[in-house]
């Protein structure tokens, strides 16, 4: 309001001042007329040049008279017009430009009126005249032609007159922003009654253009750049997306054959993606749609993302390819309101346009969490948008959506239904066969390949290892082999020559790798399943086999999962289902498949479906439960039950022990118990493991006991949920409620017995007869390898390029040199047209200066420089500046500093040099100069000449002492010579190191800092003594140990085994084992069960 009043007051003041000036001018003219200063001739001459001004004066006088006559009425009407003028101020200001443009027209009209002699004495003076509203018409947008940026241009065109451009993105004061905003509002609002349809159309055009630009940012990962040239160019113009467009680089070598242990999941993905493309007639016949969504869930490192990558590569093969889009969970999230939903819509639109396509959401729990009242509303909006896009009113067509998560409970339940995520694939820990297959995949490129029996044993020991853990073990084993064979590489930063054939991975490398790495599944919670160790396996393997045999009678599914005697012809996982692939005749379900009589009979007395009632198709059990009972120390909880669970590792195991119930303070024990049993029912067949149930039952309260028994009773009778428990008390000593859970008559009780004589003999035989008689470890081979001096490896040879690659490379290099020549011509032209440097544009005439050739050996001028540019003699700017320096040095050398003319030439030569350097420094990009030098070096190595691309018919008139002939200084191709790499030094063998330990070799070995030479030579020079072992005494000691341990339990046997092992470790360096045998006999005799 203050601003509007200020404008109004200022306008009135200006008009009042103009009226006063015109009055004074009119009064002066009257005085001159009264004095008779002008005669008629002068008056006519004056009117000839001041006719327009006099007309203006006359009009001003008339208006002034009218204003004086109507001043009273104007003051009365001022109050009435005040509100109208205030409301029109903004419009009047907006029309200032139009009024200024129309002033000339108004003046012409007034002139014509005055010439006719018509004067309106009754006309009143007004500040503004309202005009008719002129509606805004949007001008046609002219296409903007973006000039291609020059690769060598990084500054102004001239160092003398630099160009400055005001950047609109620079910081400005708030006052300037406010003034610009107000000025834009004044000049952009032509009329208050303009229609809003124009703005809406403009907004729609902008939104459409923005949408098209944003869609081009979403490109599939499995398409190459040359396959999407148009889209890729648009994307490069647009720039980076708000989301992470390339969250990971897609490894094209990962295929379905690189995924082990997940054949069922791969077959299901083929049904969803591959089969609809290959066999569309099948789906067309039954008018069905294949599943369009699946959810991968499971612990980290089990292959969820790996399967997605393999699927992307499989979809990239063949004629009809599938576009694969990959997004991480938080890629679509944005701080701007509505931007996340917009990116999701754009993603699905782009996938629909490039259908068939796949959208893979990694870590989808971060994108679509469970909606709740305590959650931020932005996530609820994103989840709602994703739900509508996956299965809303608009069909998403041939778009398959795959989600991966580690937390299935954190995903919104609305996503987990058919139509959105039709299938859910559990990526559990791999079993023995899957681990063996994964090991084969990671070691199939090794030379030599490991034995199949070794891989089977390794897979058996890798319990709880995931696919990522197994891959890490293979890599760590290879590093252990490298560290063992060549320890020298860890003491130097230079690359040494290695004999790759001497690096062999052994079993001990895998042992060291497994000791170093802890599986991810065992870092937080240790898996209950664990195979018997090699130490106790001879002692307890028979007991484990008996438990499994008893378990198969109670839980027939165990036989189904542990039986590996499938025919090799039908080993395909798709043929494991007897119900789906049986050859039994089944009645037809079609109307025309049965006669009328048989159809009526089928409707009355025949059932088509036999769900859970056919014993031939699947095993059946009634409330499977088993209790392993033994005395304390029999190993039922520490060895036997984990071994049984390991044998049944294909089943999902849920542990319900004391730490699980009371370890989490956020939930009550009853809630934890209910959740465990609920999950066991959902993932049946499964196992509920309750270790030490006698202690468990004494600690928990009555509420948890009632909850546990009630949940067990609510499990269906034929549900394959096994309850496995262990107890250190006999069945009769347990509480009555526990006894009712396990019935002895049903074979649900297994009593553990003490190991027999044969098991104990196998248990101690290896320790006493083999390990006690083993000679000390020799390290001479390791010392020889440490003394080996490895030569420095030569630089790697460049990869030989094919003819097509060489051609493409030369074309790229020639494009770069073309830019260089254009730049050098521009610089030379700017120097040549300068009048100061006209003397250097042409060669020196020998007729005018006869002694010039004798003084200057290498003449040079700007015309010769232009000729060398045309002949492709300049590969870098340094070569060009070298000739500029030559022009300057020749001028300084030939023109002495005596004559004023010579001084002027010397001055202009220095100015030429400085100007050339200044222009190049100002306008040349440093990266472009470095690129030219690299190309020059590459051409020298390849032996490629730059004259190959020079003009074919570029002839120059021969001149004596031409600078183009024999110019060795300025030709970059003749300045340097290729450097041949030195021949590598032959690697010496360890035996040669020992036989010839010279002073130089000694210093090289000491620089490696692996072992001192004196100590190494002392170890190698020591003779190997003979081994002294009394095998008869060892056999007698074994018999004594077996006899004494007749009534020992598992813990006591392990204790005795540890005592004997300590004796062997203390005498591990002795070649005479007599003292060791005496020590073992003494320890066995003093060993007591009370320990």
From Swiss-Prot:
Residues 801-825, 917-943 form a coiled coil. It catalyses: ATP + H2O = ADP + phosphate + H(+). Its main location: nucleus. It holds the Pfam family AAA. The modification Phosphoserine is found at residues 158, 168, 173, 241, 577, 582, 970, 1003. This is ATPase family AAA domain-containing protein 2. The modification Phosphothreonine is found at residues 980, 983, 1024. Residues 811-923 form the Bromo domain. One of its GO terms (cellular component) is nucleus. One of its GO terms (biological process) is transcription initiation-coupled chromatin remodeling. ATP binds at residues 298-305. The keyword Manganese does not apply. Its EC number is 3.6.1.-. Belongs to the AAA ATPase family. InterPro entries: AAA+_ATPase, AAA_lid_3, ATAD2-like, ATPase_AAA_core, ATPase_AAA_CS, Bromodomain, Bromodomain-like_sf, P-loop_NTPase.
């Amino acid at each position: 309001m203050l601003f509007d009043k200020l404008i109004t007051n200022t306008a009135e003041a200006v008009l009042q001042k103009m009226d006063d000036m015109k009055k004074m001018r009119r009064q002066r003219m009257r005085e001159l007329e009264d004095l008779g200063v002008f005669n008629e001739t002068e008056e006519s001459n004056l009117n000839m040049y001041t006719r327009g001004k006099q007309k203006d004066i006359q009009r001003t006088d008339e208006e002034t008279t009218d204003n004086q006559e109507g001043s009273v009425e104007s003051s009365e009407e001022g109050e009435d017009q005040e509100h109208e003028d205030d409301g029109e101020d903004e419009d009047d200001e907006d029309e200032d430009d139009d009024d200024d443009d129309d002033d000339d027209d108004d003046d012409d009209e007034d002139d014509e009126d005055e010439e006719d002699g018509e004067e309106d004495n009754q006309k009143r003076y007004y500040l503004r005249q309202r005009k008719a509203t002129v509606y805004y018409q949007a001008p046609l947008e002219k296409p903007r032609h973006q000039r291609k940026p020059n690769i060598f241009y990084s500054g102004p065109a001239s160092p003398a007159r630099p160009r400055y451009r005001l950047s609109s993105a620079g910081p400005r004061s708030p006052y300037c922003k406010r003034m610009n905003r107000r000025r834009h509002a004044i000049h952009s609002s032509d009329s208050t009654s303009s229609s809003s349809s124009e703005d809406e159309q403009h907004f729609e055009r902008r939104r459409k253009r923005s949408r098209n630009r944003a869609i081009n940012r979403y490109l599939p990962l499995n398409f190459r750049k040359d396959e999407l040239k148009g889209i890729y160019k648009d994307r490069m113009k647009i720039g980076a997306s708000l989301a992470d467009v390339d969250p990971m680089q897609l490894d094209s070598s990962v295929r379905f054959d690189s995924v082990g242990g997940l054949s069922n999941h791969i077959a299901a993905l083929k049904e969803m993606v591959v089969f609809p493309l290959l066999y569309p007639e099948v789906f067309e016949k039954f008018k069905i749609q294949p599943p369009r969504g699946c959810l991968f869930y499971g612990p980290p490192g089990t292959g969820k993302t790996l399967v997605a990558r393999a699927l992307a590569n499989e979809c990239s093969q063949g004629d009809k390819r599938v576009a694969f889009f990959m997004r991480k969970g938080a890629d679509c999230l944005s701080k701007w309101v509505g931007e996340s939903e917009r990116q999701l819509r754009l993603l699905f639109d782009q996938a629909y346009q490039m259908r068939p396509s796949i959208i893979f959401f990694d870590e989808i729990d971060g994108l679509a969490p469970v909606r709740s009242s305590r959650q931020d509303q932005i996530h609820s909006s994103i989840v709602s948008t994703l739900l509508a896009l996956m299965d809303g009113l608009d069909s998403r067509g041939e778009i398959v959506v795959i989600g991966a998560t580690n937390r299935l409970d954190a995903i919104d339940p609305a996503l987990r239904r058919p139509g959105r995520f039709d299938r859910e694939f559990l990526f559990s820990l791999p079993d023995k066969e899957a681990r063996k297959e994964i090991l084969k995949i990671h070691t199939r490129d090794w030379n030599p390949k490991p034995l199949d029996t070794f891989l089977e044993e390794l897979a058996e020991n890798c319990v709880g290892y995931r696919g990522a853990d197994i891959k890490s073990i293979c890599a760590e084993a290879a590093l252990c082999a490298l560290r063992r064979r060549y320890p020298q590489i860890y003491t130097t930063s230079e690359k040494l020559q290695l004999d790759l054939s001497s690096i062999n991975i052994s079993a001990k490398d895998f042992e060291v790798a497994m000791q170093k790495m802890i599986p991810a599944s065992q870092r937080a919670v240790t898996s209950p399943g664990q195979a018997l160790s090699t130490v106790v396996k001879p002692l307890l393997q028979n007991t484990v086999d008996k438990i499994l045999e008893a378990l198969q009678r109670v839980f027939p599914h165990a036989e189904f999962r542990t039986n590996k005697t499938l025919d090799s012809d039908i080993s395909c996982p798709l043929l494991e289902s007897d119900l789906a692939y049986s050859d039994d005749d089944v009645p037809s379900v079609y109307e025309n498949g049965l006669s009328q009589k048989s159809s009526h009979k089928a409707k009355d007395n025949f059932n088509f479906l036999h769900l859970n009632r056919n014993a031939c198709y699947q095993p059946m059990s009634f409330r499977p439960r088993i209790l392993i009972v033994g005395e304390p120390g029999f190993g039922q909880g520490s060895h036997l039950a984990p071994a049984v669970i390991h044998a049944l590792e294909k089943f999902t195991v849920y542990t319900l022990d004391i730490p699980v119930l009371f370890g989490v303070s956020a939930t009550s024990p009853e809630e934890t118990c209910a959740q465990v049993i609920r999950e066991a029912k959902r993932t049946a067949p499964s196992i509920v493991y309750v270790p030490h149930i006698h202690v468990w039952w004494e600690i928990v309260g009555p509420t948890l006991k009632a909850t546990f028994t009630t949940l067990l009773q609510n499990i269906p009778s034929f549900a394959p949920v096994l309850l496995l428990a262990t107890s250190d008390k006999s069945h009769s000593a347990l509480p009555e409620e526990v006894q009712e859970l396990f019935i002895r008559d049903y074979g649900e009780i297994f009593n553990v017995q003490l190991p027999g004589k044969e098991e104990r003999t196998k248990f101690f035989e290896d320790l006493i007869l083999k390990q006690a008689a083993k000679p000390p470890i020799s390290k001479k081979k390791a010392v020889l390898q440490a003394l080996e001096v490895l030569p420095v490896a030569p630089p790697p040879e460049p990869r030989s390029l094919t003819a097509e690659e060489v051609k493409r490379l030369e074309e790229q290099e020639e494009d770069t040199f073309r830019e260089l020549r254009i730049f050098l011509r521009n610089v030379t032209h700017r120097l040549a047209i300068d009048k100061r440097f006209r003397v250097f544009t042409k060669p020196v005439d020998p007729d005018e200066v006869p002694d010039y050739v004798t003084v200057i050996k290498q003449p040079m001028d700007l015309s010769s420089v232009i000729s060398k540019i045309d002949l492709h003699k300049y590969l870098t700017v340094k070569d060009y500046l070298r000739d500029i320096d030559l022009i300057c040095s020749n001028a300084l050398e030939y023109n002495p500093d005596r004559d004023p003319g010579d001084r002027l030439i010397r001055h202009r030569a220095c100015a030429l040099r400085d100007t050339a350097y200044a222009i190049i420094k100002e306008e040349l990009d440093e990266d472009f100069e470095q690129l030219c030098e690299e190309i020059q070096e590459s051409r020298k190595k390849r032996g490629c000449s730059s004259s190959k691309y020079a003009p074919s018919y570029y002839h120059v008139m021969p001149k004596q002492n031409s600078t183009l002939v024999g110019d060795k200084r300025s030709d970059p191709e003749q300045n340097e010579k290729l450097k041949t790499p030195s021949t590598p030094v032959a690697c010496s063998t360890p035996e040669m190191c020992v036989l010839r330990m010279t002073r130089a070799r000694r210093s090289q070995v000491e620089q490696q800092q692996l072992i001192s030479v004196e100590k190494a030579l002392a170890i190698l020079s020591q003779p190997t003594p003979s081994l002294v072992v009394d095998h008869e005494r060892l056999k007698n000691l074994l018999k004594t140990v077996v006899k004494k341990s007749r009534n020992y339990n598992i813990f006591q046997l392990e204790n005795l085994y540890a005592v004997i092992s300590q004796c062997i470790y203390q005498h591990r360096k002795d070649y005479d084992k007599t003292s060791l045998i005496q020590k073992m006999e003494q320890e066995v005799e003093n060993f007591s069960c009370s320990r």
